[in-house]
Amino acid sequence: PKNSEEQKITEMVYNIFRILLYHAIKYEWGGWRVWVDTLSIAHSKVTYEAHKEYLAKMYEEYQRQEEENIKKGKKGNVSTISGLSSQTTGAKGGMEIREIEDLSQSQSPESETDYPVSTDTRDLLMATKVSDDVLGSAERPGGGVHVEVHDLLVDIKAERVEATEVKLDDMDLSPETLVTGENGALVEVESLLDNVYSAAVEKLQNSVHGSVGIIKKNEEKDGGPLITLADEKDEPSTNSTSFLFDKIPSQEEKLLPDLSISHISIPNVQDTQMHLGVNDDLGLLAHMTGGVDITSTSSIIEDKEFKIHTNSVGMSSIFERELASLFKGLEYAEMTATTPETEFFCSKTVPNVDAGSIISVTERFVDGKEAGKEIRKIQTTTTTQAVQGRSVTQQDRDLRVDLGFRGMPMTEEQRRQFSPGPRTNMFRIPEFKWSPMHQRLLTDLLFALETDVHVWRSHSTKSVMDFVNSNENIIFVHNTIHLISQMVDNIIIACGGILPLLSAATSPTGSKTELENIEVTQGMSAETAVTFLSRLMAMVDVLVFASSLNFSEIEAEKNMSSGGLMRQCLRLVCCVAVRNCLECRQRQRERVNKTSLISSKAQDALQGVTASAATKTPLENVPGNLSPIKDPDRLLQDVDINRLRAVVFRDVDDSKQAQFLALAVVYFISVLMVSKYRDILEPQRETARSGSQAGRNIRQEINSPTSTETPAVFPENIKDKETPTPVEDIQLESSIPHTDSGIGEEQMPNILNGTDLETSTGPDAMSELLSTLSSEVKKSQESLTESPSEILK
């Protein structure tokens, strides 16, 4: 809402939603589905609007970048996407990287105007030009050598923009690769094929006829001597394997005339001009390293037709090995270039690779007579686009591009830089997110449902159980339990999750700082999550623990396994109990920090009130809900203990489900006791020596097979443990009708199945004592291992 009028309309719409949802939950069988559908529709609507807003912002940024490029006056004749931003002014033997930009698709490529290029090369994506622009001299009249590498175009679909990254990395002028001969040069080809799946192998065997062609550009020139990549001095030409790079004419009709062309101008001293055109639609990852000796005579290369040939036996086997091993390794093939006397060919099909792979071309230029080195990292981006796509310029930035390795995530900034323009991403609804609309709808609906429950509680003659178990309210109870089950686990996750909360509660220094480190997920703040948690817990107290409804029908409707609803309720109870434990520990710390000399109960109570007012936990800020923490010194509050009992004893039948719930409760209490009795056994590790002595006593008593006495270290703890047990039972028995869970006196015979309350607490006390014993033994053994060094101190 942008103004007060829209705010009023928004409130009216929310009120209508609340009325309709409340009516569906209270009066209609299956009304819970109305809430689920409303939630899903609202969720998809919110996320779709956010997606459209993101696309609009991205398009605005794209237009702004284009306007900035136009204002800068940067114009080029070649359609390109270039991330090259660094220009160097080099002397002899240096390199210069020129940016050639794209401003219009209608402009003719530079290679077609400056050099006689055949018309079947219109599908070039990238051209690399070697010239001598550094020297600032006039245009040399010498002809050029044009080398084109054509790859097979795969799966070009309309309205699809697939980005391909070309990374020219680590241009190294290392003297180790120099050839001492005057006409010698070393060309090293490094090929790395990555992210190619097994489908590529099948396509290679079945339907791939693509090949790479190295052809002439100067067609009007007469045939001349050919450059062979076989060094006669070092290696005989008989070992060379023919490697003919050819292209398929039938594929050229599918090629796009407006694909981007990127030119990288690298100066050289001689009149040699070499154009490498790499058609990288397939995304083959290849590293080409070329060395040209500047002393070679220009008469060999001027106005002649040249073809590059290979001398590597391993070149033809690289592709088989790479495909067989899913292209996991690097294969190197060396090609040496010498005098142009012989001609031989070698053909190899290029695998039909997924277009998401990447071509990386690295060129090393070695100057045989210059000792200087210059290393440049060039990172470029080329884009394969559909017919409706447009060529986009990306200037003045060095892109750190993702080389297609799926383990290398890109940051949002890098993704924006990498994006050539507004992409038409398919919209997908996220799994779950607490949008403000969702929270508002849930708040209003819970308020309406809680109003009914509050009316039940405040009734003068009927108890809560009478309302819950009456036939006229069965639809309400059924749908509300569905509603609670739908969101309880998401609320628990939003509160931090049970395991992170237990970790914070059982750590020696557990405090709110650890809770603050728990990542807020799903778009809901921790305060809001705790508020919803307490409200759902209050509803569960009434509708689940105080009802005799069989949940098998609800579980069948939700496709849950048997007992799944009670397990959800147990998770909810445990989450609330752990948060109460953390709140108690926080209050104790604040009380100890503020004053350690106050012993009066009245002053302690006053201090507790001050601490609670200072903390202002979200649970206490819930309207109409008092804090469940009555005694901060206790491990579990009365309400938490009653809820755990209600989970265990709700089902009268002794089934595996009931045993599972009881075992889970025992484990949960055992874990929580670590947080309680660690503070007692190890206050601040002040008496390490006495602790080690106690550990020896424990070990002697445990190892003694005839020992029937209680170890000497336990009387205090057992007294501390056992003395409050009857008091706790009395408190529990007296507080059961008045707990917040809504469990009344009428419910207790059903819950306990006719058994006495004290008899039911016996196993709990015994298991608690056994867990205390085991934890003390463990801690004493730890202190025993630490005792020698501390005794020496």
Curated annotation (Swiss-Prot):
UniProt keyword list: Cytoplasm, Membrane
Tissue: Forebrain and cerebellum.
Superkingdom field: Eukaryota
Polar residues: bias regions: 77-90, 689-710, 750-762, 782-793
UniProt cross-references to InterPro entries, sorted A to Z: NBEA/BDCP_DUF4704
Subcellular location: Cytoplasm; Membrane
Disulfide-linked positions: none
GO cellular component: cytoplasm; membrane
Major subcellular location class: cytoplasm
Region (Disordered) location: 68-92, 685-793
Membrane topology: Peripheral membrane protein
Biological function: Binds to type II regulatory subunits of protein kinase A and anchors/targets them to the membrane. May anchor the kinase to cytoskeletal and/or organelle-associated proteins.
Subunit field text: Interacts with RII subunit of PKA.
Family per similarity comment: Belongs to the WD repeat neurobeachin family.
Protein name per Swiss-Prot or TrEMBL: Neurobeachin
Gene source species: Gallus gallus (Chicken)
Designated gene of the protein: NBEA
